[in-house]
């Protein structure tokens, strides 16, 4: 945000809510180039060609009635100063994404100044693993769960209208509307694989999609307030990647629940609804009866049909019992398992044996989807048998080992919260043997002779850092320490899902 303050003269634009002139500022695209360095198109002369004159000519031609610049036949025969259509759209979308983010960034700065100390303490809330302690704490007391996919908008005008609540500059919205209509086939952008995870123009599409999800959740929260007998505590709308600090200030938004201080009012707390979301997938869980869950299901269907013009059938939203249903979320299979224990109580000369049954959240590694992911990137075949990575044989031995070790450690790090660690041994075995086969293929040797030459040094590289520390600190002779060694650990430094983990 300091870069915005230094280069963009934000105060003047903020006062008049007028962002459109910034599209003609050359340093906007220089700033966008730095923010999008990792996802820019591979163009050698990009830095030299993205001048202010080119941008002005490009935008002026977009408003021409003959639209020569977007004609398909024109592109086949001519190129405007050596550019192609993808580069045009890339340049404008990068600059426009930075401009539209200015109002959101200003609000984030105001929240940052007010809650700077709280943000430092609550930094771990950004981790994906921070959701699982919440699930462990709340889900054993709930009865029903519904796994809901947030529908994608079927028309781009819905996204443009959503931005009107945040960006009051109509000229910028008109430019966005024209840009999306003329430069893209919108039917190819609303599909899940292309809309969110598109490599080109990723920043702009993430901004549009996040605004769509933000409005959806604000309406959902309003419906939840109307269905409750008592008002909620204060909350803030969490706008992914932009309004994160509002989440820190009001920690009851993205994962929210009804927490009332007075125990006498427990009866009025009956509509006990919890909501969790990551990307386009959300979970609704309730302590109430199936009737209340069905009521929420029709809330969602009517919301999608009436507000977002998305046709959806109630039968596609399933309501399941937590005790009988396995939930797939954030790369884990989560289910409720009974934890039986026997308690012996003695009073004077009489003793009683009581069975104590408690429910706990069981998180498992989806071993079959993981093997399928490894097979797609050529670490093993469809049956899970390790194979050599032929495309890496041109690299040095150190680079090959380092790549395999990093993949193995990242997977082990992410699945450290699994209830059963044994299922990860097969994944580690595939990666280790695939690494050995790749090195043996590079040196034109056999796996056996290569292992004899390296010995156990190669296998030690695949131990994760936490495994090495535990093996040095905790002896495995004690049952209690062994149980701790095998326990679940949630790390608060995981901010994204690895491609091998994301099987959706």
UniProtKB/Swiss-Prot annotation:
Pfam families (UniProt xref): Intron_maturas2, MatK_N
Signal peptide as annotated in the record: none
Predominant place of localization: plastid
Subcellular location: Plastid, Chloroplast
GO molecular function, one term: RNA binding
Cellular component terms per the entry's GO annotation: chloroplast
Gene Ontology annotations of biological process type: mRNA processing; RNA splicing; tRNA processing
Keywords: Chloroplast, mRNA processing, Plastid, RNA-binding, tRNA processing
Chain's role: Usually encoded in the trnK tRNA gene intron. Probably assists in splicing its own and other chloroplast group II introns.
Family: Belongs to the intron maturase 2 family. MatK subfamily.
Protein name: Maturase K
Native organism: Aruncus dioicus
